[in-house]
Each structure stands twice: as structure tokens, then as C-alpha cells.
């Protein structure tokens, strides 16, 4: 067990470790190395053993979107381990206006309730409609609701699209 940096393992979805221990050096000393330094869960099997990064037990930020988080149970006799997914902690989700407007069901609402949400306004919508939509999203009680207008088309009151967000 350790809190190691091991070369070529991922810190997260975007960055790989260039420094630290070499896998071969650790596996020369042990058949199983378990580390918790990186937040990204990753397992590698080699001819002479395994290296396991357990990762965080819960999502930390929007970089963890679509990452399965949880914990491991280790059998000290056999060195076998089993991952258990954390289904209790809040998650981070990104939603786009265009996705909500074309959704055929309301499954997206589960992504909002009790979670951290980044909402992208990626198409034209009136000020009144965006206000109504944000009120509706807020009623689902997200832990955090951040709105990103970066890619929006300018809002125009006269371009009333008449979207129905009543649920």
C-alpha cells in the first residue's frame, strides 16, 4: 500500500504522470501494489503482478463526469479485491439546453436532483424562457447550478420560442 506517483498512470482524464516510480520496480518487490495518490481509478495487470489506483470514493469536480467512483474490499489472504460503486454521493453533470429541448423522456431530471450541474445555453432562447427553465431546474434541488452562457446566441425578447418547461 502507498501514496505513490507511478509513471504512465493517469492523474485524471486529461493528465498522465511522467515522474515517480516505474511499474517494474514496484512489481519486483510485490505481486500487488495499491495506491491512492491519484483521484482517477485505474488498474493494470502485468505478467508479474497488478497495480491498482483506488481513486476517490466520490466525484470531486466536473473533471470526474462519467467516472465510476467507489471503494474496494481486499481479501488479505488471496489478494483478490472487489470494487463497489458509490451510488450515494452527489455527482457532477453537464447539461445543454439543446439536449433538454429534444429529450424524449425526463431521465435528465435525475442528473439534476441532488447533484452538481453545469448548464450550457447553446442555442437561442428568450430571456423569459431561460428564466422559466432555470426556475424549473432549481425546483429539482441541485446542490449547485452553474449556467454557462459562453456559446449562447444573443437573447432576444421579440424572438419568443414558446418552449413549455412546465414539466
Predicted features and spans:
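Small-side-chain structural scaffolding
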Residues: 2, 70, 139-142
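Conserved hydrophobic/aromatic beta-strand scaffold that supports enzyme active sites
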Residues: 1, 71-73, 92
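Short, solvent-exposed loop/turn segments at secondary-structure junctions
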Residues: 5-7, 40, 58-59, 124-126
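Short acidic, glycine-rich surface-loop motifs adjacent to enzyme active sites
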Residues: 1-10, 114
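Structural motif
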Residues: 1-3, 34, 118
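Histidine-centered active-site/metal-ligand motif
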Residues: 3, 37-39, 93
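Accessory, non-catalytic peripheral segments of nucleic-acid enzymes
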Residues: 76-167
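Conserved beta-sheet core of the metallophosphoesterase superfamily
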Residues: 12-77
Amino acid at each position: 500500500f502507498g501514496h505513490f506517483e507511478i509513471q504512465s498512470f493517469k492523474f485524471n482524464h486529461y493528465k498522465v504522470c511522467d515522474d515517480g516510480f516505474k511499474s517494474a520496480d514496484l512489481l519486483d518487490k510485490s505481486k500487488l501494489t495499491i495506491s491512492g495518490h491519484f483521484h482517477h481509478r485505474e488498474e493494470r495487470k502485468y505478467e508479474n503482478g497488478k497495480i491498482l489506483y483506488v481513486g476517490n470514493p466520490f466525484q470531486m469536480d466536473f473533471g470526474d463526469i462519467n467516472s465510476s467512483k467507489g471503494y474496494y474490499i481486499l481479501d488479505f489472504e488471496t489478494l483478490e479485491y472487489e470494487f463497489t460503486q458509490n451510488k450515494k454521493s452527489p455527482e457532477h453533470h453537464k447539461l445543454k439546453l439543446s439536449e433538454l429541448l429534444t429529450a424524449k423522456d425526463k431521465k435528465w431530471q435525475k442528473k439534476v436532483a441532488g447533484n452538481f450541474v453545469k448548464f450550457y445555453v447553446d442555442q437561442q432562447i428568450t430571456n423569459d424562457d431561460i428564466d422559466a427553465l432555470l426556475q424549473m431546474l432549481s425546483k429539482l434541488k441541485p446542490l449547485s447550478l452553474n449556467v454557462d452562457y459562453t456559446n449562447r446566441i444573443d437573447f432576444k425578447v421579440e424572438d419568443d420560442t414558446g418552449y413549455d418547461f412546465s414539466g
